[in-house]
Structure formats: structure tokens, C-alpha cells
Amino acid sequence: MSAFFAERALLPSGWANNVRLEVNADGVLTHIQADSHADGAERLSGPLLPGMPNLHSHAFQRAMAGLAEVAGNPNDSFWTWRDLMYRLVGKISPDQLGVIARQLYIEMLKAGYTSVAEFHYVHHDNNGQPYADPAELALRISQAASSAGIGLTLLPVLYSHAGFGGQAPNEGQRRFINSTENYLKLQSRLQPILAQQPAQSLGLCFHSLRAVTPQQISEVLAASDKQCPVHIHIAEQQKEVDDCLSWSGRRPLQWLYENTEVDQRWCLVHATHANPEEVTLMAKSRAIAGLCLTTEANLGDGIFPAVDFLAQGGRMGIGSDSHVSLSVVEELRWLEYGQRLRDQRRNRLYGANQPMVGRTLYDAALDGGAQALGQAIGALEVGKRADWLVLDGNDPYLATASGDGILNRWLFAGGDRQVRDVLVNGQWVVRDGRHAGEEESNRAFTQVLRDLLG
């Protein structure tokens, strides 16, 4: 058992002072007591917060962050960005993927993300053929997460088609494509391996309605664990909505709700172009809206109607997706700022009994992220995994703030530099802003970039 003492900590009931926390050998919180003592405990150096789950990641895309910011096409969009992504993914080896993912996860930890849902759809070799072990690349992701020390929900993706109605895949998608049968075999191969890994679990994932058929969705759901998370990209771009209407006469979210039992297991990634009726369906189903603000802005996707969704009790979380940014602060700040820009008003996302915008944003992302990852995380609470971050207690903004003002100061006037220490599964992974493996990881990652882009 390890004991820790925080002068200020954000508990489910709110901010508390002089909090003693005890963690067992399995990395689980076993005791939390406010107004307690520090006897025999490690003193934490600043405000203590639950670690943030990152509910949407494509690890390999970190290698191309910043490469698509070159003007030239007046109609530049997600679809033109995708062409660059296809060219990059065609080159990456298993070793390179492992290096990229480890670097990414270290950077996430330093920003305050303590777990990640990896939406993993690169399955095959550069020619589109399965590896000797079809789980080769998925296992590289698991190994990278273990090496970095981040929690992981691995989401192997079923990706079979290039468009609605079962269109044949194109050459750029050759590394992604699986049949339903092979996808279920991949799940079976990974399940016992991840079950032995601390802080790792497995979920289901459909790339999008355009990449799978209705029959495939039904078959996978029928053959799988009824408790595990289910993730899908949906309604990210207007073109996707238009194409779905042409195929089915229904919008993507409308089609999904009419043809599938969507419940709290589901994470609807992006859902950018949800209309009012679909927003209501999402909120009532208690599915998670997986919002990736910096990526959606980078791709020019649009703005999710978060004010209306939150007002109806909707649940949401954040993800860094293409990793143009790896900042908890940026994702939450732009979740709020996007609504302000759309509505031309300030302070848009807050609760009926919670006027502090920072607290509303942080709580929503904790709860939604934990639900989307399907793990016992997202709160400093007995029985949950000991995942947390310690902010810099010497920072002037934080040292002079109290209660929920700490979150407002951090999220709207601060940044990643204020994340001092990070603990995952009861183990320190970042101390004084540094990860023990970052120097070696930086060197390896630099070489991979030179090899891929040179």
C-alpha cells in the first residue's frame, strides 16, 4: 500500500482540503479521507485532479501533424487531407509504428492524459497482406502503451469498404481492410493478451457507416461481449451526411438509431453535423459524443451543438484524434470557445448548479471519457484506478486560486506547462514535468520522422 497527501484535491463531491489517499499494489484507490494527516504519506506539490481520458486517437497520425498546412486547393477539406494520410500510412513499418505510438503516449502523459482509446485501423503490411500474426500492429500499440505507462482501451477497427453500400476499397485503404470473420478472429487473439496487461482493455470499433455494411454491424455486435465499449466515426463531414442520404434516405445518426440499439456502450466520434432531432436521440440514449476539437478545427469539419446537447443531459468526452495538439487544456478550451464563436456569447457550457465553466468542462470530459473507455477511471474515488495529475502549486495563477477557480485559471489562462506530476495505475510516470523515457523516445522518434519524410 502507498499513501499520498494532497492539500487540495478534486473529489466527486467537490474540492477538499488535506486529503489522504491510499493505493494498493494493483494501482486501485482503497482509501480517501479529507481533513486528514500526512503521516507516512508522500506529499503532493500542488492541486490534485483526476487524470483525463483521451477517448479518440489514431497514433500513427502524430507523424504527419503539421504537414498538411499548405494552401493551394481552394476546396481543401478532410477528403484532401486524407490523401496525404494514405501516402504516409503506406510507408510505416511495425517498428516505426511502435516508436510513433510510444512518443505520442509520453507526450499525452505530460499533458495530463492518463488513458487513451486507440482507434486502430492499420492492420496489414504495406501490400495489404496480413502479417504472420494478424495482431502484429495492434500488439505494437499495446506494447507502446505499456512502455509509456498510459492506460489503454484498444479499439481494433472493422474497415471493409470505401463508401456506403459496400463500395470496393481503394488502394490507399489496403492496410485497413478486414472481413467480419477476420475481424472477430483478431478480437479473439487480442482479448486474452490485453486481459493480462495492467490498465489495458479491449473494445469494438466500426470505422464508419461508409466503411461497413449493416449486416457487418449486426454480426459483430451479436458475436461480441455485450458490455464492452463500441466506437464509430459518424457525421463528421457534411459530405458524409449527403452521401448517407443518397444511399439510405437517412442521415448517418438517424440511420444508426433506427437500425441499431445505441446505448451507453457507444461512443459517437465527432457527430459534428447532428441536427436537433439527432441531438435529442444521442442525449436520451446516454451515448458519448466523442469530441476532438483541435482536429475538427484543423480539418474544417464544423462545430458540434454542445450547448443544446449538454442542456438535454448529453454526455461528452474529448480526444486528440489526429494529434495536431496533445493538450487537455486546448481541447477543453476550444470546446467552450467554439460555442462562443458560433453563438456570439460568452460562458456557454455550464451546469444548472455549476456556473464555473472550467469545472463543467472538466467533469463532463472525465465522466464521458471514463464511460467511453469502459474502465474504472475518471474520478478520485475508492475502487477506481489511481490515475491523477498534480498541477504546479508554485504557479502564480494556481497558487492564488481556490476551488473551481483552479480549473478556470488552468484551462483559460494556463497550459500544459502547469502539469507537474502524473500517476497512472498507482505508478508515477511524469515527475517535475519529465517522463523517464522521453529522451530515448525523442531520439527514436526523430529518426523515424527522418526515415518516413526524408
How should each PLM-predicted stretch be described?
Residues 1-19, 359-454:
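Active-site microenvironment of metallo-dependent hydrolases
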Residues 63-99, 125-134, 161-181, 238-263, ...:
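Active-site gating loops and adjacent loop-to-helix segments of metal-dependent hydrolytic enzymes
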Residues 50-62, 229-238:
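Histidine-centered catalytic micro-motifs
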Residues 1-37, 47-48:
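N-terminal metal-binding scaffold of metallo-dependent hydrolase/deaminase domains
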Residues 7, 27, 56, 112, ...:
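Divalent metal-coordination and catalytic microenvironments
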Residues 258-261, 265, 307-394:
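His/Asp/Glu-enriched, well-ordered alpha-helical/loop segment
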Residues 124-271:
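Metal-coordinating catalytic core of metallo-dependent amide/deamination hydrolases
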Residues 66-151, 181-197, 442, 446-454:
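Alpha-helical scaffold segments that flank or form the walls of functional sites
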